[in-house]
Regions:
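Surface-exposed recognition segments
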Residues: 14, 21, 39-42, 59, ...
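A short, contiguous structural element within a folded domain that forms the immediate neighborhood
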Residues: 31-56
Length: 138
């Protein structure tokens, strides 16, 4: 998915977007994620924790998920009231050295599993706590 699609899904869609949850589906990470405190240092079966508001599992924790967008650390730095701000109409940047990864993993602390958290890594970056989610846009 694009980073925008990923975040929309992680935050539970349009109806749940304003609920203030730090993690996908809850403010309590233990309810929805496999992360450093409960992972046993490995990935877990998909769906072993509660889904978010739209029924999607593991958007927080288990494995970092690659997004299609290039990562620009300053992309969201524009003021949100600016009509050209990416917070109003996110399209992603056209180039970069790394792709966006979201969601945190079994090897991460709670802060890294927040729905708002993002990092960028080169596509050659391969570890056992990275993966991807197949998605389709209608």
């Amino acid at each position: 998915p694009t980073e925008t699609e990923w975040e929309y899904a992680a935050r539970g869609g349009r109806d749940a977007a304003g609920n203030g949850n730090k993690f996908s589906g809850s403010n309590t990470l233990e309810n929805v994620a496999i992360y450093s405190s409960n992972s046993g240092n490995q990935t877990s079966v998909v769906g072993s924790k509660q889904p978010n508001e739209i029924g999607i599992y593991d958007m927080s924790g288990n494995v970092w998920e690659w997004c299609n967008d290039w990562c620009d650390e300053n992309y969201y730095a524009q003021h949100p009231s600016d009509k050209n701000s990416p917070t109003q109409n996110p399209q992603g940047t056209n180039s970069g050295t790394g792709r966006v990864v979201r969601g945190g993993s079994w090897n991460d602390v709670d802060f890294n599993c927040r729905s708002a958290n993002r990092f960028g890594y080169g596509p050659e970056y391969r570890l056992n706590n990275y993966g991807f989610r197949v998605s389709r846009t209608k």
